[in-house]
């Protein structure tokens, strides 16, 4: 959420951000309400001062034994007017708040201008896509043939866009989770948390999922609980309504969680395989930083996520996301896209975002600067480190052999206890 003072002072900047991100927000109405609110506050203050004066006059007349009935009647009229104005002010503030919720974060000046993912800008690549001497198969065919992925059983048990990982498939999923966590904890300095998979509405609001993306969330009927779409939600809200000692910053957290998404806008896209599931595993990275360090920390976070793919030997590219594809909460975002041979293209496997103080204002996360001074909002960052199911898919496709087996990446062998995944007899 943006500061109303910033919006008031920079309406053209905010209007441009709304336009660049393709959002709909009634900025003119907000500014009109803000002006009216400030005028009413001045008037209310004057009326309350007048009420205090009249109250003193009534008390004086009573002490002197004089008739105060006329002043008491005026006092009642004044109090009623104040009460009515306070109610109107509350209604104005509620309407302002609802409009504020619809205003997106301001894109950083370094973000490419564009309307869609076609305007995103490639920053760098790592690794060379493998040249196959046979026709590479898609990961779902490989997994089903090996008996390690079962989409048909999941469809019977739950529905479409779910999967059973079986045998060495379950072990590979678990190995990837543990490998990613170990890398981020032991090498990159993140502290692990294991969060709840259910959060309440205020937490979803704090990270910006609500109210805009409610249709994509799974809500538990009859409760205020939502299944988390990403561990970003509980981990960021770990510090909601708190004041952090500036000496503790930056704070790095990593977390494994299952993630749950309706994928409401994804009809017809990636309908087969692991790329777009209603439930999927992910290792998330979350940072809390001082404002002047957040962009440096974004670069480091992106490199941390990249290192997962480098260690696994998976070719990828990093893309700077343009304004129209940036999303509601981010000021700047990088996507990491892994090479998928059967697709013949790179597929998103991680997004790393700097939200500046946008989420911190919504969740009221502040810090006390080193050496004292006025409380400030932290900057929050989040990134996938990385999506586990998509990494599973990328390994099957990039490490597949002509006989249908899959070579296990070397760094995973201590976790897997096998070098090659073959069909179990």
Curated annotation (Swiss-Prot):
It comes from the Bacteria. It catalyses: tRNA(Ser) + L-serine + ATP = L-seryl-tRNA(Ser) + AMP + diphosphate + H(+); tRNA(Sec) + L-serine + ATP = L-seryl-tRNA(Sec) + AMP + diphosphate + H(+). ATP binds at residues 261-263, 348-351. It is found in: Cytoplasm. Disulfide bonds: none annotated. L-serine binds at residues 230-232, 284, 384. Keywords: Aminoacyl-tRNA synthetase, ATP-binding, Cytoplasm, Ligase, Nucleotide-binding, Protein biosynthesis. Pathway: Aminoacyl-tRNA biosynthesis; selenocysteinyl-tRNA(Sec) biosynthesis; L-seryl-tRNA(Sec) from L-serine and tRNA(Sec): step 1/1. Pfam families: Seryl_tRNA_N, tRNA-synt_2b. GO terms for molecular function: ATP binding; catalytic activity, acting on a protein; serine-tRNA ligase activity; transferase activity. SUPFAM superfamilies: Class II aaRS and biotin synthetases (SSF55681), tRNA-binding arm (SSF46589). Its EC number is 6.1.1.11. The keyword Nucleotide-binding applies. GO terms for cellular component: cytoplasm. One of its GO terms (biological process) is seryl-tRNA aminoacylation. NCBIfam families: serS. Consists of two distinct domains, a catalytic core and a N-terminal extension that is involved in tRNA binding. Catalyzes the attachment of serine to tRNA(Ser). Is also able to aminoacylate tRNA(Sec) with serine, to form the misacylated tRNA L-seryl-tRNA(Sec), which will be further converted into selenocysteinyl-tRNA(Sec). Belongs to the class-II aminoacyl-tRNA synthetase family. Type-1 seryl-tRNA synthetase subfamily. Homodimer. The tRNA molecule binds across the dimer. This is Serine--tRNA ligase. It comes from Caldanaerobacter subterraneus subsp. tengcongensis (strain DSM 15242 / JCM 11007 / NBRC 100824 / MB4).
């Amino acid at each position: 959420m943006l500061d109303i003072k910033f919006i008031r002072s920079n309406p053209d900047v905010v209007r441009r951000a709304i336009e660049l991100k393709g959002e709909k927000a009634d900025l003119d109405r907000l500014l009109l309400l803000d002006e009216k609110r400030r005028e009413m506050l001045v008037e209310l203050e004057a009326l309350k001062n007048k009420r205090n004066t009249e109250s003193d006059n009534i008390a004086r007349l009573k002490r002197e034994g004089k008739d105060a009935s006329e002043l008491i009647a005026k006092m009642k009229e004044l109090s009623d007017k104040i009460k009515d104005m306070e109610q109107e002010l509350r209604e104005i503030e509620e309407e302002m708040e609802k409009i504020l919720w619809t205003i997106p974060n301001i894109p950083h000046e370094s973000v490419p201008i564009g309307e869609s993912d076609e305007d995103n800008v490639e920053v760098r690549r790592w690794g060379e896509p493998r040249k196959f001497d046979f026709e590479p198969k898609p990961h779902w065919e490989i997994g089903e043939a090996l008996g390690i992925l079962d989409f048909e059983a999941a469809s019977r048990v739950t529905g479409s866009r779910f999967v059973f990982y079986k045998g060495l498939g379950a072990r590979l999923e678990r190995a990837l989770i543990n490998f990613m966590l170990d890398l981020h904890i032991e090498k990159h300095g993140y502290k692990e948390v294991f969060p709840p998979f259910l959060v309440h509405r205020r937490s979803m609001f704090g990270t910006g999922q609500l109210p805009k993306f409610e249709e994509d969330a799974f809500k538990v009927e009859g409760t205020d609980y939502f299944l988390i779409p990403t561990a970003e939600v509980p981990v960021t809200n770990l510090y909601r309504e708190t004041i952090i000692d500036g000496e503790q910053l930056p704070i790095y957290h990593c977390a494994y969680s299952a993630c749950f998404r309706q994928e409401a806008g994804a009809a017809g896209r990636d309908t087969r395989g692991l790329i777009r599931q209603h439930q999927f595993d992910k290792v998330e990275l979350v940072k809390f930083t001082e404002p002047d360090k957040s962009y440096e920390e974004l670069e480091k976070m992106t490199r941390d996520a990249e290192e997962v793919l480098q260690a696994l030997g998976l070719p990828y590219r990093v893309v700077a996301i343009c304004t129209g594809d940036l999303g509601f909460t981010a000021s700047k975002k990088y996507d990491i896209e892994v090479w998928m041979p059967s697709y013949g293209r790179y597929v998103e496997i991680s997004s790393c975002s700097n939200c500046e103080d946008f989420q911190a204002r919504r969740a009221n996360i502040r810090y006390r600067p080193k050496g004292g001074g006025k409380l400030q909002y932290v900057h929050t960052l989040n990134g996938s480190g990385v999506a586990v199911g998509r990494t599973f898919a990328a390994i099957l496709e990039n490490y597949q052999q002509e006989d249908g087996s899959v070579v296990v990446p070397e760094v995973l062998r201590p976790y897997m206890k096998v070098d090659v995944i073959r069909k179990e007899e």
